[in-house]
Amino acid sequence: MKVLAAGVVPLLLVLHWKHGAGSPLPITPVNATCATRHPCPSNLMNQIRNQLGQLNSSANSLFILYYTAQGEPFPNNLDKLCSPNVTDFPPFHANGTEKARLVELYRIIAYLGASLGNITRDQKVLNPYAHGLHSKLSTTADVLRGLLSNVLCRLCSKYHVSHVDVTYGPDTSGKDVFQKKKLGCQLLGKYKQVIAVLAQAF
C-alpha cells in the first residue's frame, strides 16, 4: 500500500483509506488551528447546496451504471443485492442546528469519499473496460472533495470547528469478487438514498 501523504498518517487512516482514484480527502489534524488556506467565498452555503444538488441529480444514473456493469445476478436482484443496508453509515439529523448538520454532513462526505475510492479501485480491476463507470465515479469523487472542502471552510470560518472525527466503511481489498461487487452496490444504493435527504436539508 502506498502512503499518499507525507509525515505521520493516523493508523485509522492507514487501515481504512485505500483510495485508488487519487489523493486522500483532506482530514484536518487534531491540533490544527482553525485557519483556511483561502478566504471562504461569501456564497459558500449556495456552493454547498449546488454541490449537493449536483450529486443528487447524478446519484441514480451512477447507481444504474454500477449495477449494470456488474452483470448478472445484480440487475435482476436489486432488492436483495443492492439494498442500502450499510450498518456503520454516519447518521444525519435534518432538524439539527446548521452547525450540527454541517458536522454530520462532513462525516458522511468523508465516509462516502473513502468508500468511492474503494469502489473505484475495485472496479478498475473487476471491470477494466467500464470507462463510463470509472469516469462517473471519478467525477463524483471530485465533487465530494470540493464539497468536503467547502463544508470545512464553513465550519471553520463561522463555527471555529477545526477538527471532525470521521469513520470509514469496510475495506474491500480482502473480499472476494462477489462481495466487492455487492458492497459497492449497497454503498451506492445508500449514497443515492442519503444524498436526496442531504440535498433537501440544506
UniProtKB/Swiss-Prot annotation:
InterPro entries: 4_helix_cytokine-like_core, Leukemia_IF, Leukemia_IF/oncostatin, Leukemia_IF/oncostatin_CS
GO cellular component: extracellular space
Keyword Cytoplasm tagged: no
Gene Ontology MF, one: growth factor activity
The keyword Membrane is annotated on this UniProt entry: no
Gene Ontology biological-process entries: immune response; leukemia inhibitory factor signaling pathway; positive regulation of biosynthetic process; positive regulation of cell population proliferation; regulation of cell communication; regulation of cell differentiation; regulation of signaling
Residues of this chain annotated as glycosylated in UniProt: 31, 56, 85, 95, 118
Gene3D superfamilies: 1.20.1250.10
Disulfide bonds: 34-156, 40-153, 82-185
Signal peptide per UniProt: 1-22
Superkingdom assignment: Eukaryota
Cell location: Secreted
Keywords: Cytokine, Disulfide bond, Glycoprotein, Growth factor, Secreted, Signal
Role description: LIF has the capacity to induce terminal differentiation in leukemic cells. Its activities include the induction of hematopoietic differentiation in normal and myeloid leukemia cells, the induction of neuronal cell differentiation, and the stimulation of acute-phase protein synthesis in hepatocytes.
Family label: Belongs to the LIF/OSM family.
Protein name according to UniProt: Leukemia inhibitory factor
